Amino acid sequence: MQTIILGGGCFWCTESVFQSVKGVQKVTSGYMGGEDANLANYKDVCSGTTGHIEVVRVDFDDTIVPLEVVLDIFFATHDPTTRDRQGNDIGSQYRSVVFYTDEETQKPTIDRTINKLRDMGLDIVTEVHPVHEFHVAEDYHQDYFNKNPTQGYCQAVIPPKLGKLRKEFKQYMAK
């Protein structure tokens, strides 16, 4: 079992993608990156001034879905070339970031994945950091799309990501 923390825009969207991946045991929306734990809440993080990032903690069975595939899915389902923005979500809280939990095994895989994308001509701006304090987001953010499937923002953003997942990573789709 491995854990990696990913920030690729709104955590509702990234959460929904990884909930659909075979071998993913748990996806938890949360915040990471800020200095003041008291500001790790949706209202303050949305201000873009706390240093926190909307992220998801992905716990996965790497015998079913290897880290390389988790990263490929992550990079395929968000824009890793735009700093502090994913679509209409603008601000440092939406930046592209990977927090690794094991420097010896995960960091080289992350670096290889990013270098592969750069070799393809992409200007990757994704930040890579060792994991530090993860703050679980408020309960109403957990499993958000499954609880709010008709919410307008989700309807506009999540289905295209799931379509890309289905098309490019069919063998890793759950269910």
From Swiss-Prot:
Catalytic reaction list: L-methionyl-[protein] + [thioredoxin]-disulfide + H2O = L-methionyl-(S)-S-oxide-[protein] + [thioredoxin]-dithiol; [thioredoxin]-disulfide + L-methionine + H2O = L-methionine (S)-S-oxide + [thioredoxin]-dithiol
Q: Where is the active site?
A: 10
Quote the EC number. Answer: 1.8.4.11
Q: Which InterPro entries match?
A: Met_Sox_Rdtase_MsrA_dom, Met_Sox_Rdtase_MsrA_sf
Entries under Pfam families matching the protein:
PMSR
Can you cite a GO biological process for this protein?
protein modification process
The leader peptide range reads none
Picking any one GO molecular function of the record gives: peptide-methionine (S)-S-oxide reductase activity
The entry sums up its family as follows: Belongs to the MsrA Met sulfoxide reductase family.
* Protein task: Has an important function as a repair enzyme for proteins that have been inactivated by oxidation. Catalyzes the reversible oxidation-reduction of methionine sulfoxide in proteins to methionine.
Instruction: Please give the HAMAP family that the UniProt record associates with this protein.
Output: MsrA (MF_01401)
> What protein name does the entry list?
Peptide methionine sulfoxide reductase MsrA
Please report the organism this UniProt entry assigns to the protein: Psychrobacter sp. (strain PRwf-1)
